[in-house]
Structures are given as C-alpha cells and as structure tokens.
From Swiss-Prot:
GO CC terms of this entry: cytoplasm; DNA-directed RNA polymerase complex
Originating gene: rpoA
Oligomeric form and interacting partners: Homodimer. The RNAP catalytic core consists of 2 alpha, 1 beta, 1 beta' and 1 omega subunit. When a sigma factor is associated with the core the holoenzyme is formed, which can initiate transcription.
Span list, region Alpha N-terminal domain (alpha-NTD): 1-235
One annotated GO biological process: DNA-templated transcription
GO molecular function, one term: DNA binding
Keyword Transcription in record: yes
SUPFAM superfamilies: C-terminal domain of RNA polymerase alpha subunit, Insert subdomain of RNA polymerase alpha subunit, RBP11-like subunits of RNA polymerase
Keyword Kinase: no
Name used for this protein in its record: DNA-directed RNA polymerase subunit alpha
Task performed by this protein: DNA-dependent RNA polymerase catalyzes the transcription of DNA into RNA using the four ribonucleoside triphosphates as substrates.
Length: 329
C-alpha cells in the first residue's frame, strides 16, 4: 500500500452479517486510527436520536376518560394498554398523519393484526399484543392516531395552548418515532500490509422492522454527510449588516429661515442678526430676539407660531452646532 503520508485511508471492505430481518452487524475497515470512534459515535447518536419514523401519538378508547383507569373485561389497565400501543411498528406511505381503528370482542388476545387500516399503512408486527379480553361479552373499540416524526417526543412536549379544548377521552402517548431499537458499536484493531495501527468499526443494530438495519445505517450516514456539507465549502454567507446612519440633526434645522415664509420685516431682522438657518433661530431665546432692532412682540409671536407648526420652539439646545456642511459654507 503506497501513498502520500498525508493521504487518508478510505474504508473499502464492508461486511454485512444479517442475524435476522431486524438485526444486523456491519463491519467497516480499514479506518485511520481514531476514526473508528469518531464515525461510530456520530452514527450511533444519529441512529438513536434523529431517525425519522412513525409512532402512535393519540388514542381514544370507548368508555375510557383518562389513562389512570381500567376497562371492564380488559385484563390490562389503560396505562399498560397505552404502553403496548407504543410498541406498534407502523410504516406509512405518502402521509404524515393517519387514523387507525380497532374493534374487537370476545375472549382472547387483541393483537395488532386486528387493527383496520387503509392501503397506505403497513403494520410490521401484526402479532404484537395490545391487550387481553377476559369475557365473552367484553369488547374494546379504539381510534388510534399515527404520525410521522423524528426521535423521541414526550406527550408533554406536544401539549399546546390550543389543546386545552382537546376532547375528554383523547389520550396522548409518548411518541418514539425512531425505528431503531438498539445500536452499539465496537472498534477493533485492523491491519493493512505493514500498518497495524488501523481501526475496524463494528456496528450492531436492531430495528423494529419498519426499516431494515442496512437501510437505517445508510440513512444515518446520509444525514451526517448532509450536515457536514456546510463545512466543505466553508464561507460566511451572511450579508454584512448595513448600519443606517442617523443624521446628526433634524433635516429641517439645516434649511434656511426663508423656508419659514415669514413676513419681510421679520425675515430681514433675522438676516441682520446673521440668523440664516432654522437651527440658528431655534437656539435663540425670546429675550435675545426682542433685543434685535426692529423686531417687536408681533414679529416674535409670528416666529413662535411658525416654529410651533413644525414641532420646534425657541430656546432649544443643539450640541455640535453648526454642522460641518454649514460651517464650510
């Protein structure tokens, strides 16, 4: 095996040992030292927490108002019935939300095969026991809601404000969407030619039958690869935030006093005092303006009224006045 000292080995030997339709052992080698644990732990976490699937989320049972009760003629209490329903393995095609019905009477076990469903639904474990009827006259009728999701979602996390009006008797069930029942991995030593410091990754996986183990690992690897894609072409795609600069002064203060359309007498008096901009004017006080030659109380009242109509007044304090644009003029 020849190659660059910086070149990473890629696993090329994959052995799949099918223990049963729902149980398989996958062996991957050779891997660079340390990569067995790196990849094994990442795949294990995804398989346990992030695999999509279908699960029972709500149940309505005739004659049952809450989960802390029992039903006449049924051997198990309602909590145990709900626990058994959580073990239902369901595959749903083309839908994210379906309702199933179960109607059974007479002595004997009630199993998943007794559930009525349409062609888009497949119950993988039809022999799964839901409860037992103990009397010839006993019966059980229920409506089961199955939804698509990911990982594990407790019933408490699916209670929203609008669910306060949920009908009495509709029982929420903790949803275990993941089709993976058990996952474990082990890292063993591997050898390629003269190299003895390599890893062999052994993954042992069991599912509920809704997905075969090989497909589960394939999907988990796809999820991991898609998440890592962002690092392959790493760059900051955020647009630089453009800070909107606020003007130092209200634009109206930068306008000439002529824009106030004062009488000729008042305008001339202001110009004589070198008051050219509205910003110059609002900084003056009434006392200062009354000292202006030929500007009397009538003109002062006119100026105050015009400023007030624009939300301004005399005696205002303006920091850093005049601005550079005016000072240069």
């Amino acid at each position: 095996m020849q190659g660059s000292v910086t070149e990473f080995l890629k696993p090329h030997l994959v052995d799949i040992e099918q223990v049963s339709p729902t149980h398989a052992k996958v062996i991957l080698e050779p891997l660079e030292r340390g990569f067995g644990h790196t990849l094994g732990n990442a795949l294990r976490r995804i398989l346990l927490s992030s695999m999509p699937g279908c699960a029972v989320t709500e149940v309505e049972i005739d004659g049952v108002l809450h989960e802390y009760s029992s039903k006449e003629g049924v051997q198990e209490d309602i909590l145990e019935v709900l626990l058994n329903l959580k073990g239902l393995a369901v595959k749903v095609q083309n839908k994210d939300d379906v309702f199933l019905t179960l109607n059974k009477s007479g002595i004997g076990p009630v199993v998943a095969a007794d559930i009525t469903h349409d062609g888009d639904v497949e119950i993988v474990n039809p022999e799964h026991v839901i409860c037992h009827l103990t009397d010839e006259n006993a019966s059980i009728n229920m409506r089961i809601r199955v939804q698509r999701g990911r990982g594990y979602v407790p019933a408490s996390a699916r209670v929203h404000a609008q669910d306060e009006e949920r009908p009495i008797g509709r029982l929420l069930v903790d949803a275990c969407y993941s089709p993976v029942d058990r996952i474990a991995y082990n890292v063993e030593a591997a050898r390629v030619e003269q190299r003895t410091d390599l890893d062999k990754l052994v993954i042992e996986l069991e599912t509920n039958g809704a997905i075969d183990p090989e497909e589960a690992i394939r999907r988990a690897a796809t999820i991991l690869a898609e998440q890592l894609d962002a690092f392959v072409d790493l760059r900051d795609v955020r647009q630089p935030e453009v800070k909107e600069e606020k003007p130092e002064f209200d634009p109206i203060l930068l306008r000439p006093v002529d824009d106030l359309e004062l009488t000729v007498r008042s305008a001339n008096c202001l110009k004589a005092e070198t008051i050219h901009y509205i910003g110059d004017l609002v900084q003056r006080t009434e006392v200062e303006l009354l000292k202006t030659p030929n500007l009397g109380k009538k003109s002062l009242t006119e100026i105050k009224d015009v400023l007030a109509s624009r939300g301004l007044s005399l005696g205002m304090r303006l920091e850093n006045w005049p601005p550079a644009s005016i000072a240069e003029d």
